[in-house]
Amino acid sequence: MFEYLIKFYPKIFFIVEGTLVTLKYSVIAVIFGLVIGMLLAICKVNKNRALRLFANFYTSIFRGTPLLIQLSIIYFASPYIIGIKFSVFMAGAIAFSLNSGAYVSEVIRAGINAVDKGQFEAAEALAIPKFLITKDIILPQAVKNIFPSLVNELVNLIKESAIISMLGEMDLMRRAQIVSIETYNYFFPMLIAACCYYILVMLISFIAKIIEKKMIVN
């Protein structure tokens, strides 16, 4: 056992390096997912029926199908559907962002509906353009209300990003799998990967609590 730990020690760093890859996908997905989610949420509360139908249909597709299937379609089927072969990174970033956008849109929609409608009516009475009402009055309050839910989405993205290993990306999970095959031991590599995921989630949760407290004070 002791000899194995000495032999396994250098491979720990190889696994931990995958943390950066996991973070890269998660951060990109949460940024673009937030943008997509905001646009969809605005469409969902819009009076235009066509926009509402489109946003609801989009959400139903990405919430109603597994992320693994979405990733597979974007990576393997895109050359046949749109004639473009995406790299593993692009396919992962697109799939995670589109999927995240669907979930974030529902969170933001709920946040928008939670804002007192009297503020919207008062702003309209002052002849403030609807775009500015949404951008400067409604969305800032909505984001403040839903901040914990957005953090939860980032946490979910960190864990769900492990499926990118299916395409051979050298993330935490893929590196742990490689070490498992090389050492004929699945316990320690997966334990190291699990610890890395746990530390990432705890760190993000800690930072989020600090930010949330400052938002409450402000």
Swiss-Prot record:
GO CC annotation, single: ATP-binding cassette (ABC) transporter complex
BP terms from Gene Ontology: amino acid transport
Localization per Swiss-Prot or TrEMBL: Cell inner membrane
Family statement drawn from the similarity comment of this UniProt entry: Belongs to the binding-protein-dependent transport system permease family. HisMQ subfamily.
Membrane association type: Multi-pass membrane protein
InterPro entries, per database record: AA_ABC_transptr_permease_3TM, ArtM/GltK/GlnP/TcyL/YhdX-like, MetI-like, MetI-like_sf
Domain ABC transmembrane type-1: start-end pairs: 19-208
Annotated TM spans: 25-45, 57-79, 86-108, 187-207
Keywords: Amino-acid transport, Cell inner membrane, Cell membrane, Membrane, Transmembrane, Transmembrane helix, Transport
GO terms assigned for molecular function: transmembrane transporter activity
Gene (name only): glnP
Taxonomic lineage from the root: Bacteria, Pseudomonadati, Pseudomonadota, Alphaproteobacteria, Rickettsiales
Superkingdom to which the source organism belongs: Bacteria
UniProt protein name: Putative glutamine transport system permease protein GlnP
Job of this protein: Part of the binding-protein-dependent transport system for glutamine; probably responsible for the translocation of the substrate across the membrane.
Source species: Rickettsia conorii (strain ATCC VR-613 / Malish 7)
